[in-house]
Amino acid sequence: MKNKKFKRVLVILGGTSGERAVSLNSGKACIKALKKKKYSVSTLDPKFKNINLIDKRKIDVIFNALHGKDGEDGVAQSYFEYLKIPYTHSGVISSYNAMNKLVSKDLFIKNKILTPNFFSAHRAEKKINNIKKILIKKKMYFPLVIKPVNQGSSLGVKIAKNFKDFKKITLHLFKNYEQLMFENHIGGQEIQAAVINNRAIGAIELIPKRTFYDYKAKYSKAANTQHIMPARLDRKNYKKVLSISSKAHKVLGCKGVTRADFKFFKNKFYLLEINTQPGMTNLSLVPEIAN
């Protein structure tokens, strides 16, 4: 947002996804920062005002502060493209690639970026016993991470410690999500890195008090997640995680800012996912890394 010809900024925030609260907080933080820089700022919340009512004659650029479904999966971006209005963050295809964990993992593997072993199942075509057979065939083990294919902010992410957990969690999640991904749980350090305009700017380490870095650990002060900046890595590995982050950003075709989520275990970095609409709240990691 350094281009001063973009003086009139429309911040789109809120929306109707499960990440609405985070989006509102991110949007408010961005509005405050933009006003401080003397931009003319207007707002739109798709929950209360149809996004089709955007009047492109009154704005120069859209700051997309939406999170989750329709906001960071290429849907909103495709409408911005239709209106021919410049907007922040990644484009249609890269947003879809990053939001769909199966697509992004496939791209990671094709580009030799290490990611945890996984497979997916659709509720309409798989039974629990069939999924169990696939687990055995693919030599996957417990604990196992089970997550929706296209959700952000760790919504719906669960960890199964045994087959009893696995069955209970899978049946529960299939009530709300059509497709799930099953992924080997990787121990070790939780590392996240920020990339801005293709350049990785830093990496932070997280020590959650909860079982893992879930939604509450990310956005609740009460969760008491410890942030260590910079991450406790030697010089070689610190440079390596930044390099992988930048590579993944480019592989997915991203632009602007992204956040890469890793586990560092036995001297290897496992890339979990790329977030194209990272949070901008006072608890969010990208602002902390940037500062």
Where are these regions (language model features)?
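ATP-binding N-terminal substructure of ATP-dependent carboxylate-amine bond-forming enzymes
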Residues: M1-M99, V103, H122-K132
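Conserved metal-phosphate-binding beta-hairpin within the catalytic cores
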Residues: N184, A193-V195, H249-N282, A290
